[in-house]
């Protein structure tokens, strides 16, 4: 099992899909990485030699922000929006959608479980 950027890649998957298990690398970036290193997309993860795995590690480390660093950057970006007091920051602080969706009936994922209001018993 190849371990790249702190993630164990699934052995049976083709490399172009196996690399997408790393946070911050999608299908497009995985194909760019494999092209840069010169590895066939159809090669399975268990078929990787140690040299090929090292080349992929080097390519990712030099050119991509992945896993913990990327998560930290996203969290810091959201925190800076909240500190600025921008509209998006306020929406993040309140736990509501930031991108203009309606919230009267939907947005249950962001708002959480329904809270019934005004239905008190006598």
Curated annotation (Swiss-Prot):
GO terms for molecular function: rRNA binding; structural constituent of ribosome; tRNA binding. Residues 95-116 have a biased composition (Basic residues). Part of the 30S ribosomal subunit. Forms a loose heterodimer with protein S19. Forms two bridges to the 50S subunit in the 70S ribosome. HAMAP family: Ribosomal_uS13 (MF_01315). Belongs to the universal ribosomal protein uS13 family. The gene is rpsM. It comes from Aliarcobacter butzleri (strain RM4018). Located at the top of the head of the 30S subunit, it contacts several helices of the 16S rRNA. In the 70S ribosome it contacts the 23S rRNA (bridge B1a) and protein L5 of the 50S subunit (bridge B1b), connecting the 2 subunits; these bridges are implicated in subunit movement. Contacts the tRNAs in the A and P-sites. Keywords: Ribonucleoprotein, Ribosomal protein, RNA-binding, rRNA-binding, tRNA-binding. Residues 95-122 are annotated as: Disordered. GO terms for biological process: translation. Pfam families: Ribosomal_S13 (PF00416). This is Small ribosomal subunit protein uS13. One of its GO terms (cellular component) is cytosol. InterPro entries: Rbsml_uS13_C, Ribosomal_uS13, Ribosomal_uS13-like_H2TH, Ribosomal_uS13_bac-type, Ribosomal_uS13_CS. PROSITE patterns: RIBOSOMAL_S13_1, RIBOSOMAL_S13_2. The keyword Ribonucleoprotein applies. The keyword rRNA-binding applies.
């Amino acid at each position: 099992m190849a371990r790249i950027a702190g993630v164990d890649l699934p052995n049976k998957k083709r490399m172009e899909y196996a690399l997408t298990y790393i946070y911050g690398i999608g299908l497009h970036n995985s194909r760019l990485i494999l092209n840069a290193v010169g590895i066939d997309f159809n090669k399975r993860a268990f078929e990787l030699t140690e040299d090929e795995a090292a080349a992929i590690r080097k390519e990712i480390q030099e050119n991509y922000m992945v896993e913990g660093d990327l998560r930290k950057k996203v969290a810091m970006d959201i925190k800076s929006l909240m500190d600025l007091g921008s509209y998006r920051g306020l929406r993040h602080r309140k736990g509501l959608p930031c991108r203009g969706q309606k919230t009267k009936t939907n947005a249950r994922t962001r708002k959480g479980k329904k809270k019934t209001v005004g239905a008190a018993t006598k």
